[in-house]
């Protein structure tokens, strides 16, 4: 097969591993910077061009689209879909996952466990919002944040009010969530491919930090998931409509709660911690599922 990888940098670990895995199975691979792709949006013959040449003959596309280029990246992916190329993750599903509020609303509607979460626009509603999420300590999150950036732990009510007012003053959209203290600064990253959890790791925040993201200096180790945690991860991926994703879960006193569904999860941490060839599993998924014009808009909302 001929496989395209949408990635800004061919040297990144995840991109390199996907290239290696695909080529090891005899596939032709081309890494494309999505920002260098341009499109002819025509009903008779939609096309994509890259550095002056028309892109043709691709059987599948693997989107590795960073949060900062979601709009243009998903537009390029959508054009591949219009051309009948099989997407590992569909553009609409990536858009759902990138909108934290939308994804939480969809997960809530389907009964997936979540931390108590509030959302408001007016500073006049801060008191009521804090009451809804059971007061401090609580977590304030920027809707557009990634890799732990824009996530603040407010340990007192006064601190919470100050942080929320500051973000609102900057016209930033924020979520306010309960702080799951019993998680102890750890979370679970469950890697889902084709409706199955193929690998998992437990991430632990560094000393003095509550965010367990590896980009924030956290550490990772292999972990054994409970059946309920495994089922929660699979259901979350299905609700958002992602074939390949990382589902982040906290172990709370009332069961597993999902804090994020990542549409473009990194491979280095999960492969190192679990010892699983995740890149190879993604290529196997493509081999088993890629067919022309097989884009069906999975999930709803």
Curated annotation (Swiss-Prot):
GO cellular component: cytoplasm
Binding-site residues, Mn(2+) 2: 260, 262
Gene3D superfamilies: 3.40.50.20, ATP-grasp fold, A domain, ATP-grasp fold, B domain
Protein name: Probable alpha-L-glutamate ligase
Listed EC numbers: 6.3.2.-
Superkingdom in the source lineage: Bacteria
Protein encoded by which gene: rimK
Membrane-spanning intervals of the chain: none
Binding residues annotated for Mg(2+) 2, in chain numbering: 260, 262
InterPro entries: ATP-grasp (IPR011761), ATP-grasp_RimK-type (IPR013651), ATP_grasp_subdomain_1 (IPR013815), RimK (IPR023533), Rimk_N (IPR041107), Rp_bS6_RimK/Lys_biosynth_LsyX (IPR004666)
Free-text remark on how the cofactor is bound: Binds 2 magnesium or manganese ions per subunit.
Keyword terms, alphabetized: ATP-binding, Ligase, Magnesium, Manganese, Metal-binding, Nucleotide-binding, Protein biosynthesis
Database matches in NCBIfam families: PRK10446.1, rimK_fam
GO biological process entries: protein modification process; SOS response; translation
Cofactor(s) required, per the database record: Mg(2+); Mn(2+)
């Amino acid at each position: 097969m001929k496989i395209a990888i949408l990635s800004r940098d061919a040297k990144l670990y995840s991109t390199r591993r996907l290239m290696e895995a695909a080529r090891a199975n005899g596939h032709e691979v081309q890494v494309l910077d999505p920002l260098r792709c341009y499109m002819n949006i025509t009903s008779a013959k939609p096309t994509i061009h890259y550095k002056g040449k028309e892109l043709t003959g691709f059987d599948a596309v693997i989107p590795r689209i960073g949060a900062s280029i979601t709009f243009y990246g998903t537009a390029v992916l959508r054009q591949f879909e219009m051309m009948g190329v099989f997407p590992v993750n569909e553009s609409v599903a990536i858009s759902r996952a990138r909108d934290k509020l939308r994804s939480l609303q969809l997960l809530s509607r389907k009964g997936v466990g979540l931390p108590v979460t509030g959302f408001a626009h007016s500073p006049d509603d801060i008191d009521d919002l804090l009451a809804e999420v059971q007061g401090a300590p609580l977590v304030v999150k920027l809707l557009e944040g990634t890799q732990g950036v824009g996530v603040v732990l407010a340990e007192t009510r006064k601190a919470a009010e100050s942080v929320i007012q500051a973000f609102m003053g900057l016209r930033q959209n924020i979520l306010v969530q309960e702080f799951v203290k019993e998680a102890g600064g750890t979370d679970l990253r469950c890697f889902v491919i084709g409706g199955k959890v193929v690998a998992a790791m437990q991430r632990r925040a560094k000393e003095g930090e509550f965010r367990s993201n590896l980009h924030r200096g956290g550490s990772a180790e292999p972990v054994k998931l409970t059946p309920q945690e495994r089922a929660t991860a699979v259901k979350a991926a299905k609700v958002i409509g992602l074939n390949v994703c990382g589902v982040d879960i906290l172990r709370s006193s009332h069961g597993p709660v999902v804090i994020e569904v990542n549409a473009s999860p990194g491979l280095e941490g999960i492969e190192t911690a679990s010892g699983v060839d995740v890149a190879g599993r993604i290529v196997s998924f493509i081999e088993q599922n890629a067919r022309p014009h097989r884009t069906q808009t999975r999930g709803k909302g």
